[in-house]
Amino acid sequence: MNGILAVYRKELEDHFSSTRFILLSTLILMVSLVIAFMVGSGLRDELKDVAKPTFVFLMLFTFPGKLFSLISFIAFFGPLIGIVLGFDSINRERSDRTLSKLVSQPIYRDSIINGKFLAGLVTITIMFLAIVLLISGLGLRLIGVVPGPEDVWRLAIYSLISIFYISFWLGISSLFSVIFRSMATSALAAIACWIIFSFAVPLVASPLADAIYPVDQSTTAPDPELLVQHEQARKAISLLSPMTLYSEATTTILDPLRKTTQSLLLMGPMERLSISRFQNPLPLRESLYIVFPHLISLIAITSLCFAVSYIFFMRQEVRST
């Protein structure tokens, strides 16, 4: 345990003093605040003469401003945080010839990779919680609505899901750092996975579903069973993307009016407020039931990536030269 803590403290100090991490975290924080400001200003203007519902505070995170929502921003660019923290975690030690010195210390070998992953996880947690707290404070000032207990719980669960989502990319980049000796190669491999899973998979989901279950668009009344099979196939393919898992889970958690992980309608704030008068929002427990498979999937793939990294690292030969 002492070995893990020693590596953890050293890596945590390196992360917070790294120039690239400081620049990336500052950029993400600034963009997040700009998005929250635009969304908050728009909500304040539209809700000026309207009775504010209890969940209006959560709209800061779910509704797009002039660009996109905070959920979409974290879904697309949050993985870069994990990649930056992990792509050189092991091969940097190899290139600096310090890995053999670490292994020769009176610590267990697995303390090295465990301490490095723990430091990355804590760094992600601190950074994301700082973003959520700053946006919440900005929202309090802009829309003047104090979040209720359920809003706080939903934000806490949203933060937990986001931390696991970014940690998955930390595990992916750490795995490539163990496999490849070149830091540039591991970084490119991690970025390639990010592009494939975040952009390519959602784009090809519909064409693949069309190929598996072709729907004749020329007919006025297509087969309902075929339409259901087509939609199920498209959803199954899109769920291969961690970004889709994350987006559906967090949107359902932060939007109490959503009773499914996928919505066919796009509504603005005023439409949301109008429809809320005719339906009751889901309680937190019901929302958790809906997103529980997504949360378990994110935890599973994150654990799998770290486990594979752990096995590869423990079986690799470490030479002193």
Language-model features and meaning:
Residues 32-44, 54-74, 119-174, 178-179, ...:
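Secretory targeting signals
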Residues 18, 22, 163-200:
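A structural motif at transmembrane helix-loop-helix junctions in multipass membrane proteins
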Residues 179, 292, 296-321:
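Junction motif at the cytosolic side of a transmembrane helix
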